[in-house]
Amino acid sequence: MLRRTFIGALSAGALLMTNGMILKGADAPAGEVAKNVIRRQPYYFTVADRKFRSGKGDVAFLGGSITEMDGYRPMICEYLKKKYPQTQFNFIDAGVSSTCSNLGAFRVEEDVIQRCEGGKGPDLFFVEYAVNDNQDGFFNLEQSIRGMEGVIRRIKAANPDAAIVMIFFANIPLMEKYRAGEVPTSIQAHTAVAEHYGISTVNVAKELQEEIDAGNTTWEIYGDVHPAPQGNRMVADMIEKLLDYVWRVPATCSLCALRSSEVEPLDPYSYGTAGWVDFDAAQTEGFT
């Protein structure tokens, strides 16, 4: 069995290039598709739509046990199969229980990118780490940014046109922060990454908090940290609203004038070049 360890980025990560140019996500128009669902960079979803209509498509899901479980993920897979009945999908479940965004940055090359056709990365990518960065990693803002930004930079380096959906799932501490008028640290960090790279977001934590406070549902009905079928259906409905919206009218690459030679990372120490090495090849001495 291969023995592995971590290597991380201590400098700017890989460039997010499309035909030699890079799109600045922060300059892209954004809009609220539905309550707590934000659409950014619809062009990338149009690219995914074209790929799916060609007959093939790579769709990947990265996260913790919420992704790994039989929950929202298979619901979205069924939605896509119904929407594109002639398409041969390669669905990738890269959820691993109790893992956070930092480990996600190390895993994404092997567990997602290399499992796609030609090792070129997914056409459509879903990622969630808000809950685990909060309750498992107890990450501060810097740690959450570095992990999630590392994931995004690795995906975009592999496939610059990947359409990405970032999902903020719910736990009680996250909802309590919203009730106190604050934005939870992990969601604040991941939102900063989403805004910087023009990534669409689905804020389940905020949606659920508002619905509970309005008396429309309960935490028990939703199903706790690992949602029950009804809770996962709520999440899938939010994602499907986003996808229905961005695929209703094809978007053109009208933002090409905003492209530049590079997008600087939010944090130069984010894990944009993170990966695995064999223990036998790892350098254990000589550091200064």
Predicted features and spans:
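Short hydrophobic segments within beta-strands
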Residues: 62-63, 94, 167
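Short strand->helix junction
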Residues: 65-67, 98-101
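N-terminal secretory targeting modules
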Residues: 1-62, 66-89, 118-123, 233-288
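Alpha-helical cap/lid subdomain in secreted, periplasmic
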Residues: 74-90, 99, 103-249
